[in-house]
Amino acid sequence: IAIAGNEEASIGTMLRTGNVKYDEVDIINVGWALSSSLASGKVDAIWGGLRNFEINQLALEGFAVKTFFPEEYGVPTYDELIFVANAQTYDKSAIKGFNKAIEQAIIYIINHPQDAWKEFVAYAPDTLNNELNRRAWRDTLTRFATRPSAVDWQRYDEYAQFMYTHKIIKTLPKA
């Protein structure tokens, strides 16, 4: 695993759906060497990888993998990227402008994936223009939120309850 701080709760929840206890598996911190650890046989599974990257990296290296998405195995759905502003000093108009720019970029990428890809790789073609990034790009397209400034308070409350129940947090916030 790559240590995230919630691995016991998340992995434990997923394992329980298969009647396996967390303490019945050996957890090995491989840092960020997820793909190479799995490919080398050092570990039998990895946790902490990106949905659009490690799967593709391993496939390109000739390894067939089975993916287990946490939300399909008892872990509440959560947003993987959240922009946070200081509650005391934020600039409301700057945040609105930022969110609008993110939304416009996402809509452009979804509507014009090939043009957006060309613009992306033009930044650093020697390192970005390769098959792994092409596959990751393709898989990322389906994950974009078309309304990035929208907030699902119930989703946040459900994940907060999950973290509180598993003692990741000491107090239960209300979204």
Spans of features found by a protein language model:
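Short, well-ordered beta-strand elements
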Residues: I1-A2, D26
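Short beta-strand-to-loop elements that line the ligand-binding cleft
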Residues: Y22-W32, T67-F68
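Class I S-adenosyl-L-methionine
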Residues: G12-R16, A59, V121, Y164
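Short helix-capping segments at alpha-helix termini
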Residues: G18-Y22, G62-F63, D126-T127, I168
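Secondary-structure junction motif
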Residues: A2-T13
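Secondary-structure end/capping motifs
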Residues: D91-K170
